[in-house]
Amino acid sequence: MTNPTPRPETPLLDRVCCPADMKALSDAELERLADEVRSEVISVVAETGGHLGSSLGVVELTVALHAVFNTPTDKLVWDVGHQCYPHKILTGRREQMRTLRQKGGLSGFTKRSESAYDPFGAAHSSTSISAALGFAMGRELGQPVGDTIAVIGDGSITAGMAYEALNHAGHLNKRLFVILNDNDMSIAPPVGALARYLVNLSSKAPFATLRAAADGLEASLPGPLRDGARRARQLVTGMPGGGTLFEELGFTYVGPIDGHDMEALLQTLRAARARTTGPVLIHVVTKKGKGYAPAENAPDKYHGVNKFDPVTGEQKKSVANAPNYTKVFGSTLTEEAARDPRIVAITAAMPSGTGVDIMQKRFPNRVFDVGIAEQHAVTFAAGLAGAGMKPFCAIYSSFLQRGYDQIAHDVALQNLPVRFVIDRAGLVGADGATHAGAFDVGFITSLPNMTVMAAADEAELIHMIATAVAFDEGPIAFRFPRGEGVGVEMPERGTVLEPGRGRVVREGTDVAILSFGAHLHEALQAAKLLEAEGVSVTVADARFSRPLDTGLIDQLVRHHAALVTVEQGAMGGFGAHVMHYLANSGGFDGGLALRVMTLPDRFIEQASPEDMYADAGLRAEDIAATARGALARGRVMPLRQTAKPRAV
């Protein structure tokens, strides 16, 4: 057994129980406090895993915000929440940090039920400005709300929702602070000089003079530096020769500011708080992974990490027992793309997370990363399909929710053959309820023209990719869970499946279990438990929720006293469609006992996937108990045909 990593010495942080304690610290002490918070973040995440790089990048900004503003009366809204660990440490949750992302522990994101310092929960991007503006207008209408501050990253601000909020905030012209945390752009020396000059001026003059001050500084510089400063300012503002983009939207723009310069941050935030009347955007440039060399040198690899050695940065990864679903998808799609030049892939800022980075390395001109823009991703894919391409739109289940109108209106209504790759289906573990893939089956299966599949294992996933490649009759979707497969034998190449055709994987006579998706192995385990009690069980894999294999369902009903459907999704999904079919086809007329097993009607909090499914009542033991109870109430109808359920 290894000894735990020694915790860092943090004399200043030890004195801070809540942000109010920071008011007594000098600016120099606040700078040292930031160093201690950074050490604490590294120590914590080394033990728990989590989002490291983003949190390290905002340490100074977090300290400065809590030192200047009066949270929780002032509402500090973090976008996404990946970067919230320093915030949690400073707001009374330090002693709980080593429970981060664990069962019964702290969330990895901001969460209203966790702390008064988390006024708005986050885990999906680009929501912060809208929420902060809502708080600001609540204040204007008499609610006990102080200042409102939204902290949003340069990735999140690419999403349309952020610009909708900026546009509305500019129109309302109420006091609101937006901090643009830009961690993808370094500051060259001329830009640093410009930023410092603007910081000094902002502490002495109204913000309205900042543009004139910037122009004056540029004019005073030698030729090459003057041109460089002008280009740099235009680069970060995007509106050469006129107002900045943010100013055109009605904001006062300040920046860029070095987000690791505590003095500059404190001066800027204090001046903003003292003088602002309308909305102001402060552009802060930070470095992802700041202060920890492994994370600075590989920000993509240290965005989200497993437990790691804080000295070397080496992450602790368990040995895989079976292929990873996402990698199976990425590799298989790449092989199919080598055979079919019409195949393209689309991702919304998640090339590695969705596996399309594998194809991107081989066919870079056929993989499109559209940024955090799921709505655009879906309709862009629809356009590609309309042009004759075979687009695979790869988006996590929980993020696909953001593009639902586009799926319905731009894809399904026009019957365009977009292939939806739905990763992270079902419960996902440490990221908890915000990232659970619970609702996609329900909201997609209800759409006309849609074909919907769910992979029972990694081999089935390969077959479904091949099916999607061959399917040009309309939109088609397939879903699969996070993590490892179940260790089945893998085919060399996928077989095209017949749409709406399931398979029987085990034959029995008493009760039938019809599984949709990756809970098939739990259904098979349940069958073994029942078999040991003398109950004969048929287990079938539906493969499709739309179209349903009604022939298979009919045969299961005719030959069994009870039928149990099992799925890794919410109510209103596969089982609901089976029940609807049976109700309209007379399947219940003879006394069939049907039980529909889904995720419960609540959000399931973070834990290991095994614990989450136990909480949901979807273990093999739960399936067996449900089947046992159904069998006790069902009765066998006279057979209307003699054929047994077909096996594949």
UniProtKB/Swiss-Prot annotation:
One of its GO terms (biological process) is terpenoid biosynthetic process. Mg(2+) binds at residues 154, 183. Binds 1 Mg(2+) ion per subunit. Its cofactor is Mg(2+); thiamine diphosphate. PANTHER family: 1-D-DEOXYXYLULOSE 5-PHOSPHATE SYNTHASE-RELATED (PTHR43322), 1-DEOXY-D-XYLULOSE-5-PHOSPHATE SYNTHASE, CHLOROPLASTIC (PTHR43322:SF5). It comes from the Bacteria. Homodimer. Belongs to the transketolase family. DXPS subfamily. It catalyses: D-glyceraldehyde 3-phosphate + pyruvate + H(+) = 1-deoxy-D-xylulose 5-phosphate + CO2. GO terms for molecular function: 1-deoxy-D-xylulose-5-phosphate synthase activity; magnesium ion binding; thiamine pyrophosphate binding. Its EC number is 2.2.1.7. It holds the Pfam family DXP_synthase_N. It is an enzyme of class 2 (transferase). Keywords: Isoprene biosynthesis, Magnesium, Metal-binding, Thiamine biosynthesis, Thiamine pyrophosphate, Transferase. This is 1-deoxy-D-xylulose-5-phosphate synthase 1. The lineage of its organism: Bacteria, Pseudomonadati, Pseudomonadota, Alphaproteobacteria, Rhodobacterales. SMART domains: Transket_pyr (SM00861).
